[in-house]
A protein has these predicted regions:
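A conserved hydrophobic helix/loop-capping motif in glycosyltransferases and polysaccharide synthases
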Residues: 2-14, 18, 25, 35
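Acidic donor-binding segment of Leloir-type glycosyltransferases
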Residues: 19-57
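Glycine-rich, basic loop-to-helix element that forms the pyrophosphate-binding segment
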Residues: 58-75
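Flexible acidic/His/Gly-enriched loops in nucleotide-sugar-dependent glycosyltransferase catalytic domains
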Residues: 66, 94-158
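Conserved nucleotide-sugar donor-binding catalytic segment
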Residues: 132-216
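Catalytic core of nucleotide-sugar-dependent glycosyltransferases
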Residues: 194-203, 207-235, 254-266
Length: 298
């Protein structure tokens, strides 16, 4: 049924806990494909599990996007799921998705909310994806209203048909993938209402760089390939500022306020102006405002 693709780079210590978490699935209708992206210490799986585990090691570092592509190409099952080594699936995720797919046989893409935990701040919120009938390039250019790779399932043949994740990008690869995906004429989506993936986020994490060079390159690439109309440009200009603000706000940097001021100038939204001032005063306070709205947009 499913092949779960797990890219890993220099985090082999996370793999045993991830695999152990998957033993709690209510059905074992899946296998796991771990793609070790040329880690300094190779990923090794010596324990046996109630599902098949395949480890593929890249001879050179390829990046997360190509590692997922390699996993997809080597997947044995019809459907692909994606899991990062520090995220977790709900215990009934594979069963619920299988039930949906059995009932809706014309579907080739499934997605669902995620429960996101802000570890340092001590609270969580649930994302709020749009409905399938609302999905369009215009809506996604305004914001990724579907979710990241751990929140989706896609048929392998469709994934490969559209070329998988772009290896030309080192940022926003999942966003670019969704823009490609929704333009395919065979695209047929189904939304599951429950959050079926648990994601953790750490502010001030050393792995989150405030260097937005790759993000800006990805924004330029997406603008060139997908923005065709004045309305699309208007939408994407706003989202671009959000995406540039993200690494700064996650590093609790007041520089994020600059991007929120830019959003205010584009939207004339008082809410964005207030956010900009709050970020300028205290980025940590701005993040904690999510406590007031536990049901959040993606």
């Amino acid at each position: 049924m499913f092949s779960i693709i797990v890219p890993s780079y220099n985090r082999k210590e996370e793999i045993p806990a991830l695999l152990e978490s998957l033993t709690k699935q209510t059905t074992y209708n899946f296998d796991v494909v771990i793609v070790d992206d040329c880690s300094k210490e190779p990923v090794e799986v010596t324990q046996s599990y109630p599902f098949a585990v395949k480890v593929i090691r890249n001879e050179t570092n390829q990046g997360a996007a190509e590692s997922r592509n390699i996993g997809a190409r080597n997947a044995d099952n019809e459907w692909l799921l994606f899991l990062d080594d520090d995220d977790r699936f709900a215990n009934d995720k594979c069963q619920k998705l299988a039930d949906v797919i059995a009932e809706h046989t014309d579907v080739n893409f499934v997605y669902h909310p995620a429960k996101c935990e802000m570890v340092n701040e001590g609270f969580s919120y649930v994302t709020n994806p749009i409905e399938p009938q609302e999905i369009s390039v215009e809506r996604i250019l305004l914001a990724n209203k579907i979710g990241g790779m751990p929140m989706i399932g896609v048929k392998k043949d469709l994934f490969l048909k559209i070329g998988g994740l772009s290896t030309a990008l080192r940022s926003l690869e999942d966003y670019d993938f969704l823009l490609k995906l929704v333009q395919d004429p065979t695209f047929k989506a189904y939304k599951v209402a429950e959050p079926l993936t648990y994601c953790t986020f750490h502010t001030k994490r050393s792995s989150v760089s405030t260097d937005t060079t790759n993000t800006q390159k990805a924004i330029d690439y997406i603008r060139e390939h997908y923005v065709k109309t004045a309305e699309q440009e208007k939408n994407f200009a706003i989202n671009a500022e959000y995406m540039l603000a993200y690494p700064h706000i996650m590093n609790l940097s007041r520089k994020a306020a600059f991007y929120y001021f830019e959003i205010f100038k584009l939207t004339k939204s008082i809410k964005q102006l207030v956010i900009a001032f709050v970020v300028l005063i205290s980025p940590k306070l701005a993040i904690n405002l999510k406590r007031l709205d536990r049901k959040s947009v993606v």
